[in-house]
């Protein structure tokens, strides 16, 4: 997706700061066939499922950046009255070591939702390298 391509380009070019307003959420939408419980209660409603999976997508993007040594936050950058898609992912490269809890949470989320984020494919070498040196 365009957002994942932009994030991967920034990471691969050692960007110190990354700011993206994510679009292109459909990749995980197609992967989620059945939500882990108790989330199935929400995902049985099409619109709610779409919005929830959008949030899962952006949360996984943020977590991948965190695993690669970025301090990350997700903020609203335009009021909700203008658009429902008003999230910005902000990341600053710190190189800080990652806590094992962060890795565990990412792995559990991917496993529970049975998804493979496109960004993780694009950055698989860097994620593996971070794991090999003990950063993950």
What are these regions (language model features)?
Residues 1-136:
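Class I S-adenosyl-L-methionine
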């Amino acid at each position: 997706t365009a957002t994942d391509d932009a994030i991967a380009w920034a990471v691969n070019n050692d960007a110190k700061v990354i700011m993206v307003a994510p679009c292109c959420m459909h990749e995980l939408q197609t992967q989620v066939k059945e939500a882990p419980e108790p989330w199935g209660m929400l995902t049985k409603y099409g619109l709610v499922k779409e919005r929830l999976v959008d949030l899962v997508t952006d949360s996984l993007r943020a977590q991948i950046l965190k695993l690669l040594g970025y301090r990350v936050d997700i903020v609203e950058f335009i009021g909700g009255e203008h658009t429902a898609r008003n999230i910005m992912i902000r990341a600053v490269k710190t190189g800080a070591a990652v806590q094992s809890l962060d890795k565990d949470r990412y792995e559990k989320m991917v496993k529970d939702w049975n998804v493979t984020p496109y960004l993780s494919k694009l950055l698989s070498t860097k994620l593996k390298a971070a794991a090999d040196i003990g950063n993950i």
